[in-house]
Amino acid sequence: MPNLLFGVESHHHRLAILDWQGPLIAKGMFDVALLLGQNTKIEVRQKEEKQLLERYLVGLKTYGVQGLTFDFIWDDYRRCTLYTWVYAAGVAGTLDPTNEAGRAWMGQMVSRQSSASEDLKVFDLLPS
């Protein structure tokens, strides 16, 4: 990802993320779902997802957010993962299909989104 900046010296942050591609007003979990569901290798997400969400919850509590449980965070993550299909469809519609790099990126994004959706059973959230 060209918007992931990795620190190379000891005084740098290990990772900085710059995201200006699709500015919108949304809950923070939407960004978490996008990062984990579409931009993280499937096997890494599967292995680290719950630990990262636990860390996210600790961070929220550290900065004064109260009343959240892991179960709430998990359910919110699943809902936001379902919603990120809207983002994937919007981005796909704006890419130039003749651009090889864009096509490869989109293929990875959809593959990862599909895997996350299946793993998290997000379609079970839809009314029947």
Each model region followed by its residue ranges:
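Regulatory N- and C-terminal appendages and interdomain linkers associated
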Residues: 11-13, 71-128
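Secondary-structure junction/capping motif
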Residues: 4, 27, 69, 103-106
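Active-site activation/catalytic loop segments of kinase-like enzymes and analogous catalytic loops
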Residues: 22-65, 81-103
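Intracellular signaling interfaces of 7-transmembrane GPCRs
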Residues: 64-72
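Active-site acidic catalytic loop and adjacent metal/ATP-binding pocket
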Residues: 1-28
